[in-house]
Amino acid sequence: MVRIAVAGAAGRMGRNLVKAAHHNPAAKVAAGSERPESSLVGVDLGELCGECKFDVVVCDDLAKQIDQFDVIIDFTAPASTLNNLALCQQYGKSIVIGTTGFTEEQREQIDLVAQQVPVVMAPNYSVGVNLVFKLLEKAAKVMGDYCDIEIVEAHHRHKVDAPSGTAIGMGEAIAGAMGNKLSDVAVYAREGITGERTKDEIGFATIRAGDIVGEHTAMFADIGERVEITHKATDRMTFANGAVKAAVWLHEKPAGFYTMTDVLGLNDL
């Protein structure tokens, strides 16, 4: 059984991760952390997420419980995630990263640490979204040369980064299938007189409103027809269950950088 620590356990996503780990027969909730100033430090993790008492309380530093867990699941913020990554590097633990908003330099740091410890990192842990990534690769190879490609994403009002990591992942899947780097073809905002659309660009539009869990659409538009590939999430447990699945899969894997494509065995599609 894989012993799981959840970083940011008292947040919306953290509570779902605790619940998902509790209900996964191959996993055990072994630790959970929050910021030292949080009033929820010391609260039982089971009671925190509406389950039975686990006899495992929220701590203010996972280093204090380093012997209690095998894998950290981290959906917090870049600085916090990098601290937990360093902890994994120091003690030989594995980590599942769902945090988004990393800079290019921070991504390079993650890649470097992944040479020493097992890391799964994905912009989205839903099975459906990762299948969409594969579908987008295939669509881009067939239609990318002659269609205009746009990505539209919508999330709740509290999301702090834009575009979403999933939207960027969709763009990377499309650009990679066409032999491009997303950074060379992405257009993240349009305003005023922009001129005509260039042939290779991939446009992004962002919506932040209400309580939208996550909606993403990639559009391949030609004259007379368009293809839209859409994923809509209605419950954060979708992401939490996928992340716990990744943690179970990652346990005892050799050091390396893995994605949900590896976890789900989608490379053969």
Curated annotation (Swiss-Prot):
EC code(s) of this entry: 1.17.1.8
GO MF annotations, alphabetized: 4-hydroxy-tetrahydrodipicolinate reductase; NAD binding; NADP binding; oxidoreductase activity, acting on CH or CH2 groups, NAD or NADP as acceptor
SUPFAM superfamilies given in the database record: Glyceraldehyde-3-phosphate dehydrogenase-like, C-terminal domain, NAD(P)-binding Rossmann-fold domains
Main location: cytoplasm
NCBIfam families: dapB
Record-given protein name: 4-hydroxy-tetrahydrodipicolinate reductase
Gene that produces this protein: dapB
Binding-site residues for NAD(+), renumbered to this chain: 8-13, 34, 98-100, 122-125
Xref: PROSITE patterns: DAPB
Species: Vibrio vulnificus (strain YJ016)
Task performed by this protein: Catalyzes the conversion of 4-hydroxy-tetrahydrodipicolinate (HTPA) to tetrahydrodipicolinate.
Keywords: Amino-acid biosynthesis, Cytoplasm, Diaminopimelate biosynthesis, Lysine biosynthesis, NAD, NADP, Oxidoreductase
Annotated catalysed reactions: (S)-2,3,4,5-tetrahydrodipicolinate + NAD(+) + H2O = (2S,4S)-4-hydroxy-2,3,4,5-tetrahydrodipicolinate + NADH + H(+); (S)-2,3,4,5-tetrahydrodipicolinate + NADP(+) + H2O = (2S,4S)-4-hydroxy-2,3,4,5-tetrahydrodipicolinate + NADPH + H(+)
